[in-house]
């Protein structure tokens, strides 16, 4: 058996077409959606991510602003800029690209963003709302994974789901969204004693560790859906995920490739969250 590929690129194009239509409708009413992106420092990966986010806004009818600062920017100046963006009616979403330089407290920065503009879904108010099942924004990567599972009609109610990784950005919110969908969820991490004992019983596995080959064929239940959130480089410098793709695709029922799987969905869901924020604001001021 060879797994069916979950095509994140194709799904993201469909969702972006919907975003563009909604953005056009808002703009026609004088409410063009706007995303502010802030980059501090010169991390090469962050520069690529930010460039892709700004381009995605432009391509789909969203306005965007891009503030780029040197790595030695004082924390107080960054917080002051966030305060300005919070009060700017043209901006519906604020994204501060992580990681930040060591002298800047990322928690303080995230908490400075107005919850109604926190389109990454990282603010403590939004994290708490996610816990209670009433999120204002769902974090982009887990939200994208849920859209993929739904698009391929992978059943979650009553399913055993394993999330490998416990980060605030992916692992924890991923587990909560799967739980909300009716799955029985296990979170595994670096201290888990026997990872394979958990994954072999899973109908759905989401790997989000940043470790190559954390999931291999003998660890996967035949027919399972395997979602690879990882972004790594192999020995030849080629982009790869956390999953041993060549081996696992011969056992799994569904699998996401890297690249072309979860990656395109993350930016797409950022656009979706920004559109939702703009629609919410337009409705409140109608």
From Swiss-Prot:
Q: Which EC number(s) does the record attach to this protein?
A: 1.5.1.5, 3.5.4.9
Q: Which reaction does it catalyse?
A: (6R)-5,10-methylene-5,6,7,8-tetrahydrofolate + NADP(+) = (6R)-5,10-methenyltetrahydrofolate + NADPH; (6R)-5,10-methenyltetrahydrofolate + H2O = (6R)-10-formyltetrahydrofolate + H(+)
| Keyword hit for Oxidoreductase | yes
Q: Which residues form a coiled coil?
A: none
Key words of the record: Amino-acid biosynthesis, Histidine biosynthesis, Hydrolase, Methionine biosynthesis, Multifunctional enzyme, NADP, One-carbon metabolism, Oxidoreductase, Purine biosynthesis
Q: Which PROSITE patterns match?
A: THF_DHG_CYH_1, THF_DHG_CYH_2
User: Mind telling me which Pfam families this protein's record contains?
Assistant: THF_DHG_CYH (PF00763), THF_DHG_CYH_C (PF02882)
Show the GO cellular component annotation of the record: cytosol
Q: Name one GO biological process term.
A: methionine biosynthetic process
Q: Name one GO molecular function term.
A: methenyltetrahydrofolate cyclohydrolase activity
Q: Where does NADP(+) bind?
A: 165-167, 190
Pathway, according to UniProt? Answer: One-carbon metabolism; tetrahydrofolate interconversion
Assembly behavior = Homodimer.
Summary of the function given for this chain in its UniProt record: Catalyzes the oxidation of 5,10-methylenetetrahydrofolate to 5,10-methenyltetrahydrofolate and then the hydrolysis of 5,10-methenyltetrahydrofolate to 10-formyltetrahydrofolate.
Of which family is this protein a member?
Answer: Belongs to the tetrahydrofolate dehydrogenase/cyclohydrolase family.
Record's protein name: Bifunctional protein FolD
Organism equals Paraburkholderia phytofirmans (strain DSM 17436 / LMG 22146 / PsJN)
The gene designation is folD
